[in-house]
Amino acid sequence: CIADYFHFTDYYISGKDTLNLDYYVLSYNKQKALKHFQQVKPMLNCFEHYFGPYPFQNDGFSLIETPYLGMEHQSAIAYGNNYLPGYNGNKNFIAGLDFDYIIVHEAGHEWWGNSITTNDIADMWIHEGFCTYSEVLYVECIYGYQKMIEYIQNQKRFVRNDKPIVGPYGVNKKGSSDMYQKGSLMLHTLRNLLDNDELWFSLIKGISNDFKYKIVDGVDIINYITNKCNLNLDSFFDQYLHTSKIPLLEYKIQKEGREYVLLCRWDAINNFDMKLLVNNGKEDIWIFPESEWKEFTLGNFDIKNFSIRDDLFYIDTKKVN
């Protein structure tokens, strides 16, 4: 006998389809599980909204209690988060977020990792970056946009920037564990760089549907994104995927007459020219920094209200004299 498991079932309606939900929990956790797993159906609804239909309809969806935290086995997720919110009770210091991290993250892998799988573990950012970003979208779906911003900002403190998140190819070696949070932050940055949520969400769903049940390389996903966006994103992906640094915006502000002028430049890889939002306390303003100093007029405003929108873009900033 493996353990004294209690098995209970539920179902999730998706359009004209019915998805079987099976839960296997230790018998003494029956009442906890009956209540705790109620978050599964709203989560599946969010993920189907963003990524398309659950990819393993015939297999069903299962959670199986285990003595370890979790693993994304296809249609049979190992669950060991002790029926607690966050990561084994750690809510990551964001008030009001009470979801179970293991359920949400491992379920996200049904789309990112199980349905779409990388050819080489060097490109595991496709699994973990997109799946960690699925947590972000889940928060936006259930708790709203502002809580999503708080959640994505909190992910920054887990990034070490120790080495690139893409590993060497052909030698069975992963890149940095930053593939989780840094990968998510890269996608969040790309969403705001596009400045078009209709395009962004069609892009995410398009990747999920067009590469369903396929083995992919990182270049497949990057080419898909650049073609759909009709943008040259080579330097963007090179910076975030193939270096251990994030772009640094050096800047200074000067007053010319009644107006303030922003001088800035990127300290990043060659040809990095990502546009960026700043705010003068009245409105967001697009700027277009490059590697050389450029000047942007911000208008007449209270300088104390100036901010760089690093809540929307994963960058470092440095004010210089």
Residue ranges and their predicted role:
Residues 39-50, 82, 102, 106, ...:
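Generic, well-ordered alpha-helical scaffold segments in large soluble proteins
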Residues 41, 46, 79-80, 85-149:
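Zinc-dependent metallopeptidase catalytic helix centered on the HExxH motif
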Residues 1-104:
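Hydrophobic helix-coil surface modules that form long, contiguous segments used
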Residues 233-234, 249, 253-310:
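Beta-strand-rich binding/interaction modules
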Residues 55, 176-256, 262:
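Amphipathic alpha-helical substructures
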Residues 124, 128-189, 193, 211:
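Acidic/His/Gly-enriched intrinsically disordered linker/tail segments
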Residues 30-41, 93-94, 98, 102, ...:
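Soluble non-cytosolic domains of exported or imported proteins
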Residues 310-321:
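Short acidic/polar inter-strand loop motif in beta-rich domains
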